[in-house]
């Protein structure tokens, strides 16, 4: 096999969920694809790191020249309800339900000492600043996955909010039992909507 083809297969196999057999199929697909398609794909891959940035408010993704994402800029959204999620993909999945019109805060991970992810690695400071700046009561929805890491993360958020002398009440809610055995990424739309609609105050 040509070295460049082997190199491409190896690179593709590093993508999440792609094993060597699938990587080989994709490499041969690209080998037989139109050159314009390949160049466009290569350009998009190259630009993804240089032309996409993080929203300064919620840490969602936006175009490089923008300070805030489309959700944060949307005044029709409920600014006093903030869904805290682990990553951008969780936001996308919730948004695909077309039901909820609140705002978000992306922490970037969950507390996980075994993976060397600690409190200072996450965007807690920015979350608490958003709560403190609010001029009304706020609801914080812990839209998180049912695992040990997120139990620790949720507990930290709850404890920190309770310790602070906030001017307005902060209501903290968790997803209902509908999502007790499902990760947000894998939950079907109805299960996720029910889990969010029937969220419980902690």
Regions found by a protein language model. Name each.
Residues 169-202:
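Conserved phosphate-handling catalytic cores of large alpha/beta enzymes
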Residues 48-51, 65:
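Short metal-coordination and nucleic-acid-contact micro-motifs, chiefly zinc-binding Cys/His arrays
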Residues 1-16:
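Extended, structured, electrostatic nucleic-acid-contact surfaces
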Residues 62-64, 77:
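Short functional micro-motifs and their immediate structural scaffolds
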Residues 94-114:
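Histidine/lysine/aspartate-rich catalytic loop segments that bind and position anionic ligands
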Residues 81, 85-86, 137-150, 157:
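Acidic beta-strand-to-loop metal/phosphate-binding motif
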Residues 55-58, 69-72:
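Short cysteine-rich clusters marking metal-coordination/redox-active sites
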């Amino acid at each position: 096999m040509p070295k460049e083809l082997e190199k491409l297969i190896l690179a593709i196999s590093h993508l999440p969920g792609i094993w060597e057999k699938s990587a080989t199929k994709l490499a041969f697909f690209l080998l037989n694809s139109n050159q314009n398609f390949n160049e466009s794909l290569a350009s998009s891959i190259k630009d993804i790191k240089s032309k996409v940035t993080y929203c300064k408010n919620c840490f969602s993704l936006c175009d490089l020249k923008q300070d805030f994402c489309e959700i944060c800029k949307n005044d029709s959204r409920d600014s006093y309800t903030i869904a805290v999620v682990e990553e951008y993909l969780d936001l996308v999945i919730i948004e695909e339900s077309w039901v909820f019109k609140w705002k978000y805060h992306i922490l970037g991970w969950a507390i996980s000492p075994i993976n060397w992810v600690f409190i200072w690695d996450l965007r807690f400071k920015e979350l608490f600043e958003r709560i403190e700046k609010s001029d009304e009561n706020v609801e914080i929805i812990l839209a998180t996955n049912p695992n040990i890491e997120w139990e620790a993360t949720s507990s930290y958020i709850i404890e920190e909010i309770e310790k602070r002398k906030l001017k307005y009440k902060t209501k903290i809610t968790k997803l209902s039992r509908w999502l007790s055995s499902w990760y947000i990424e894998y939950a079907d739309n109805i299960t996720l909507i029910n889990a969010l609609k029937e969220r419980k105050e902690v």
